[in-house]
């Protein structure tokens, strides 16, 4: 490439005073490339790729825009040095001032907010009770006034600076309604206004690494002698209670300490005796010929046990419809009962409302003693 003097050969069209719009007009780019390079030689797409030893290799993509922070060497050595492009056209500033390569920080020019600005936008993941507990827990004397709690929340969480009225009311409500916060009056020699608020010692274990776990109190946590009664988790089905003790006795897994108790309640009867009593009572009602006027007493006697094999004899009067002789319409309606199952009327007459009214489910099916739930 032959050297030339840009001042002697530069036409006035090559350096018009274009406004700084951030990109090169296509007409200007075509004209300058056709003027500076012969048509027979392939012209590069970017002027920063000229193969000259005077240019130092750089990774800045905006070198050809001739920003004010870039001072490229002139084409011809001498005191009268000029830049490759006119200064009026390259008024765009460098977008990536601290950039050493495109791969390092491509988005370095974006306005990234600081941490304080992010905290103003994002709500803290803590409840108001947790904020109060954090403020009191961080105080030297483990007590703070209401105004001091406000100040702690506002200083450490900039999110609450924009709407103070809303969250301050919530702070006051939590102090009044939460049992973990206790009001302590001021001393006589302590000047100031307002009472102190402290954290209940029993609730300190609920404050764990800034997480105020909302958990109901358990009566089994602290026994009368001041020791933990049990280490079983909350809601365990094996907790000590009279009802659960009865179920354990029924399953045969009662604890050894309750075997010698003088007030031990009798275990409820098993399912099989209850079912047998029910079947025997039904057998007695079906086989009885006289009207029933009173309920049969509970108990599985030997007579009813002997009749267990004969309890279904009364149901043998079932007659299939296919074996019945043909009758007329009047004979059929007069001789056959209206029930759809084919049973004789004598069997169904035994199960009258008087039969069900005479049976007491409380004393016939189950024994009332020892089965209270």
Curated annotation (Swiss-Prot):
Region listing for Disordered, in residue ranges: 1-23, 208-274
Feature: compositional bias, Polar residues: 238-258
Keyword check for Transmembrane: no
Any one Gene Ontology molecular-function term assigned to this protein's record: DNA-binding transcription factor activity, RNA polymerase II-specific
GO cellular component assignments: nucleus
BP terms from Gene Ontology: anatomical structure morphogenesis; axis elongation; cell adhesion; cell differentiation; cement gland development; epidermal cell fate specification; negative regulation of endodermal cell fate specification; negative regulation of mesodermal cell fate determination
CDD domains linked: FH_FOXI1
Tissue expression remark: Expressed dynamically in a dorsal to ventral wave in the animal cap ectoderm in late blastula and gastrula stages. Expression is present in the cap in a salt and pepper arrangement which is maintained throughout early development. Expressed in lower levels in the mesoderm. At later stages, expression is lost from the developing nervous system, but epidermal expression persists through tailbud stages.
Main subcellular location of this protein, as a coarse class: nucleus
DNA-binding region: 123-217
Induction info: Inhibited by nodal signaling downstream of vegt, and by notch signaling downstream of dvr1/vg1. Neurula stage, but not early stage, expression is regulated by canonical wnt signaling.
Keyword tags: Activator, Developmental protein, DNA-binding, Nucleus, Transcription, Transcription regulation
SMART domains: FH (SM00339)
Subcellular location: Nucleus
Keyword RNA-binding: no
InterPro entries registered for this protein in UniProt: Fork_head_dom, FOX_domain-containing, TF_fork_head_CS_1, TF_fork_head_CS_2, WH-like_DNA-bd_sf, WH_DNA-bd_sf
Purpose: Transcriptional activator. Activates ectoderm, in addition to inhibiting mesoderm and endoderm formation; required at the blastula stage for normal formation of both the central nervous system and epidermis, the two early derivatives of the ectoderm. In addition, also required to maintain the regional identity of the animal cells of the blastula, the cells that are precursors of ectodermal structures. Also plays a role in differential adhesion, which limits cell mixing as primary germ layers become specified.
The protein, known as: Forkhead box protein I1-ema
Gene this protein is translated from: foxi1e
